[in-house]
Amino acid sequence: MIKLSLQSLCYRDTFNAGKITMLEIIDKAAEYRMDGVDLHFTHFASTDDDYLEEVKQACLKRGLHMCYIGVSNNFGKTGAELREQIDLMKKWIDVAARMGIPMVRTFGSWVPDGESDESAWPRLVESTKQVAEYGESKGVVVGLHNHNHGCIPATGDQVIRLLDDVDNPYYSHILDTGQYLGSPGVSLGERGKEDPEWNFYGSIETSAPRAVHVRAKIYRIASGEEAWLDYDRIMPIIKNVGFNGWMSIVFEGQDELDEPTAVPLANSFMRSM
């Protein structure tokens, strides 16, 4: 059975305004009778043992599984800056191992000006291999999050290529339903409208068999149903590959609706799917 988790970034604006803490976000997940939480690395107040234990116990006492730590890296950088990105991933793999969290989210590369996807690709593969090998040594899976906004991999084919090029059992795939090229939620083209040049539902189909976690993106939920993404089309794709794992609710419609109103609506909608 697919299980629902709350991505802590659903409360991005509330958190940034100092009106909620990660521990209080965990309380919200329990209040909405969700099954787990995804914890963004910027929401940790500390990496001291006492604080990490407090977070772990808060989830345990509320019956919530800690699905993954989301880290925002960029393997498109070079030199010392690239080494810093690799070290950032290793730091949070260590945190995950200390907390018993099975996975850490990774991005690919934001391709620098003057480079092509192909010229940046070998650097992406080599950096990711280092991180995946480190994850393997710690017993923590590194989950590739497909992303657009100038980032690769941005298509289903690119995701499969990178997974195969890295070729490590501790390197897997976190499928984001709204972040493939052509999605109404991406930055290229007119936001809110599907780009017909790209078959983003096809990208979801391509990478779904490799997914160990799905991020269900929510952009417009004021009506009680997601308006930009067609979940009547997406959910059969996910279910038909036998997916039986975790699905995060990830709200990114703060320009339309406030987070305290939107998150319970998104939870109810995804449960209806």
Each PLM stretch: what is its role?
Residues 6, 29, 37, 59, ...:
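Conserved, mostly hydrophobic/aromatic
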Residues 64, 101-102, 140, 241-245:
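A short helix->loop->beta-strand "cap" motif at the edges of active sites that frequently abuts
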Residues 246-254:
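Short acidic/histidine-rich active-site segments
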